[in-house]
């Protein structure tokens, strides 16, 4: 019998959660805000939140400004991107070993149906999230 621990495997990474929280916060606050303010609001370490902020900046969901009057703000050009697009950029969705051909050592993967089932589940999840835009978060 195949045992899939949904609590462990079908879960977004903490970084993805923090990225979504940052976007929600920024959409509900006008102008530039400090990472520290967001960290305090959510009770999250500033250092951990900074990792999410850097990723969002790299993906162009937010705009960062350095210096004493610096901070971060929502990139309005990202508001029409879908949640599916965001989460696909942040997650690898390699739920089981056979999803990664480079590290797959499973001896039954050529005959196993599980990979197809999980691919369908992932597709359904991402297709559902295509219905929602980043602007819908707040």
Task: Specify the residue positions occupied by each region the protein language model found.
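Glycine-centered, phosphate/nucleic-acid-interacting loop/turn motifs that mediate DNA/RNA or nucleotide
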Residues: 60
């Amino acid at each position: 019998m195949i045992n899939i621990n949904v609590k462990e495997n079908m879960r977004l990474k903490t970084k993805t959660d923090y990225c979504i929280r940052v976007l929600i916060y920024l959409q509900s606050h006008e102008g530039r805000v400090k990472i520290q303010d967001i960290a305090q609001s959510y009770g999250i370490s500033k250092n951990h939140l900074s990792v999410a902020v850097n990723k969002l900046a790299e993906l162009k969901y937010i705009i960062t400004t350095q210096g004493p009057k610096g901070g971060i703000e929502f990139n309005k050009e990202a508001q029409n991107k879908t949640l599916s697009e965001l989460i696909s950029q942040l997650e690898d969705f390699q739920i089981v070993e056979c999803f990664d051909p480079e590290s797959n050592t499973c001896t039954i993967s050529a005959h196993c149906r599980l990979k197809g089932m999980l691919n369908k589940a992932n597709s359904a999840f991402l297709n559902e999230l295509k219905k929602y835009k980043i602007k819908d978060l707040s």
